């Protein structure tokens, strides 16, 4: 998502300002206007209940994610140099707000597991009133969520930031939610700006039906989503495109096909697109050569990765995979530097000289 329409930003700025100054009353007024209901209570305590099969499936996804993500830890950095014990310590933020679009229980899993593993003390879910299902509340309880804020959109996020004291906001959502995250990033940390779903498929040596299946799955997210199918096999591309035209609905985004001369050309194209998802069939080395991508599924449909492969489906979009990646516990942590004098400070003169050169008199005097 590259930039926001001016009218969207102006509208969201007003909502954020109104909720900042007007608190819960303003947030509830916006909820009634935009979602048709002013929820009571606005904060819901997670509890057991709901369809046990759905809850069990969500917890199976959580278990898969935790098995991998529990192995992620910030690199330890401890060093003694010039009379100083130096360390980089990683600390979790105290409070996090996880934005979960209505009914997307899997997104709750993909955000709450990393936040919990990071050590966040208070994890809140922000979701529209219609998203507060018994299943969501049950999964939230199992994943250690403190409360569910039944206020969606910009007004819900603004309330969480200004009146619940969260330190980080994370999660996907529509245009107005992402505009709110952009504005609120002046006050709190965010995971990024997430836009429409993106998929690139590289297929070689598989039936065209296999290649098209993943594209149809991702493109059903809506007309603003898009997918590319790459292959050195022109016949595969032709049949796949025919299948897509036959199966697609009017609400789906476009599928573009491109014949490539080989892996080198494919990797170069993928890195230029920097897609959210990459689905690789037949040539696994493509997955390991690509630099700019959110997450890769190899010889499996991307929806398996979306739900249970153990990698969060909260991913960079809009080309931002060039500099950021899949969400992990590190999104809810921050590095703190500590320098402790434990011996003679051998670099004192170098520090004093730099202070003198830069014109900081009292810096220099403090170093004498």
UniProtKB/Swiss-Prot annotation:
Catalyzes the sequential NAD-dependent oxidations of L-histidinol to L-histidinaldehyde and then to L-histidine. Gene3D superfamilies: 1.20.5.1300, Nitrogenase molybdenum iron protein domain. It catalyses: L-histidinol + 2 NAD(+) + H2O = L-histidine + 2 NADH + 3 H(+). Zn(2+) binds at residues 218, 221, 306, 363. Keywords: Amino-acid biosynthesis, Histidine biosynthesis, Metal-binding, NAD, Oxidoreductase, Zinc. Its cofactor is Zn(2+). The keyword Transferase does not apply. InterPro entries: Ald_DH/histidinol_DH, Histidinol_DH_CS, Hstdl_DH. One of its GO terms (biological process) is L-histidine biosynthetic process. The active site is at residues 276-277. This is Histidinol dehydrogenase. One of its GO terms (molecular function) is NAD binding. The gene is hisD. Belongs to the histidinol dehydrogenase family. GO terms for cellular component: cytoplasm. Binds 1 zinc ion per subunit. The keyword GTP-binding does not apply. Its EC number is 1.1.1.23. Substrate binds at residues 197, 218, 221, 277, 306, 358, 363.
């Amino acid at each position: 998502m590259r930039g926001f329409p001016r009218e969207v930003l102006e509208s969201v700025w007003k909502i954020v300002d109104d909720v900042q100054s007007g608190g819960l009353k303003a947030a509830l007024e916006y909820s009634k206007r935009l979602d048709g209901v002013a929820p009571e209570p606005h904060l819901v305590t997670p509890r057991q209940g709901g369809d046990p099969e759905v809850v069990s499936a969500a917890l199976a996804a959580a278990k898969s994610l935790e098995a991998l993500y529990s192995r992620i830890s910030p690199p330890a950095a401890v060093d003694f140099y010039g009379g100083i014990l130096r360390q980089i310590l990683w600390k979790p933020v105290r409070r996090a707000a996880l934005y979960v679009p209505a009914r997307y229980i899997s997104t709750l899993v993909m955000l709450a597991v990393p936040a919990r593993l990071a050590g966040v003390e208070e994890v809140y879910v922000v979701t529209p009133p219609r998203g507060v299902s018994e299943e969501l509340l049950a999964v939230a309880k199992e994943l250690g969520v403190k409360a569910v804020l039944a206020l969606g959109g910009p007004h819900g996020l603004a309330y969480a930031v200004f009146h619940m004291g969260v330190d980080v906001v994370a999660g996907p959502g529509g245009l107005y939610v992402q505009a709110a995250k952009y504005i609120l990033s002046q006050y709190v940390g965010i995971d990024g700006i997430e836009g429409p779903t993106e998929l690139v498929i590289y297929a070689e040596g598989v039936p065209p039906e296999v290649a098209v299946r993943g594209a149809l799955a991702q493109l059903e997210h809506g007309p603003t989503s898009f997918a590319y199918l790459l292959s050195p096999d022109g016949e595969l591309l032709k049949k796949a495109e025919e299948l897509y035209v036959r199966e697609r609905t009017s609400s789906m985004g476009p599928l573009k096909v491109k014949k490539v001369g080989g892996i080198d050309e494919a990797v170069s194209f993928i890195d230029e697109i920097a897609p959210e998802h990459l689905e690789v069939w037949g040539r696994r080395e493509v997955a390991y050569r690509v630099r700019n991508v959110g997450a890769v599924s190899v010889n499996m449909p991307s929806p398996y990765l979306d739900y249970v492969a153990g990698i969060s489906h909260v991913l960079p979009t809009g080309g931002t995979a060039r500099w950021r990646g899949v969400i992990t516990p590190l999104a809810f942590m921050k590095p703190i530097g500590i320098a402790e004098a434990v011996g003679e400070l051998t670099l004192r003169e170098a520090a004093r000289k730099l202070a003198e050169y830069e014109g900081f008199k009292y810096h220099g005097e403090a170093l004498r």
